[in-house]
Amino acid sequence: MLALVILSTGVGLVLLWPSRDAVDDASLADQFAVEGMTYPTARIDAINEGECEDQSAVSDDPAFSGQSVVQHCDIAEVTILDGARAGERTTVQLGGSLTASGLRPDDTLRLMSLSDSAADDQEGGLGSAVTENERSSDGVLGVVRNVPLAILAIVFIGVVIAVGMLRGFLALIALGFSAMMVIYFVLPALIAGGSGTAIALVGASAIMVVVLYLAHGVSMRTSAALLGTLIGIGLMAGIAQVAVSTTRLSGLGDETSNVLASMTSEIDFRGLLTCGIIIAGLGVLNDVTITQASSVWELRAAAPGLTRREISVRAMRIGRDHIASAIYTIVFAYAGAAMSVLILLYLYDQPMLNVLTQEDLSIEAVRTITSGIGLVLAVPVTTWIAAWLLPPAVSPTNEASGARPRLR
């Protein structure tokens, strides 16, 4: 059965692997790039309080009707570090999230810079989008965070290897493979307009096959966990498909999705949402299944005379405890990720049921519930599979003589 699933996954990868032409056709780079736009880095020399071009505005949201929305801005004096303008000093406006990010002198920004000549060339095509003021100023694309992110990554890798040793190192290799699958298969296939559910099923299955065998070794124990994981993935896919359809979710629950929808018509956003639900549930699902399989094997090693049924019953007691903690993990993870949304909806002062039916919060609810159902069902499935694959019990006579079942 497992061999058939692995073979089907390989066939699915071949059939769903996106062509380079399809991805290029859907790419946004050529369609929305502005000729002459450069992205130099710049060091902050000083930050001064300033005013936005539109310091305040009246909100169009009926929940905040008549209330002014104050926009605080700072002005940063910066020195451009690279490109044709290296060494040049200029000023940029810091608004929105940049004012709350704790920027200080010597921090590095990524700028958007359009030369005067390029602005002249683009003026005919962009109409009034390029003004005289915009030609002589630079915008901030974001903060350069390479160094702190690299330090965090190094610390993470060091801790994993120090504690997990060889197993930890193999887990990092497996994590790298997972990232490659997402970058080179899942994302391009979604961009090319493929089915989100099919892409998630094939991609998640391929990831789990490699990750489990690489991180935990090739054994019957790992195979039991893999079978349980693959069944859990299938359950999550089916539940997610039904949940997204019946709750009438569009998949456009955040600003990024709406911006993306305005730029391309190739992506199926409901499929994208379904794919995201499945991929997001992989980690905790894998955690539960590998733990259950290990519990079954350790119970057999500790009590070789127990029958498969007795081991299944005892392993399910362990599994129920794991289910409780895993459910908390899922709920708190999604609640933490959606904290800003929760605060915003709280400020609306609406009944809780009304709040929960908003698209952005409904998406989080569907993600949590779908992952939770798949996780809970994977526990008994994995337990039964692992117990079925166990070597038979040792008779009391053989157990007294020190005989032990052969475990792998």
Predicted feature descriptions by range:
Residues 112-114, 126-141, 156-168, 186-192, ...:
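Short juxtamembrane and helix-loop transition motifs at transmembrane-helix boundaries
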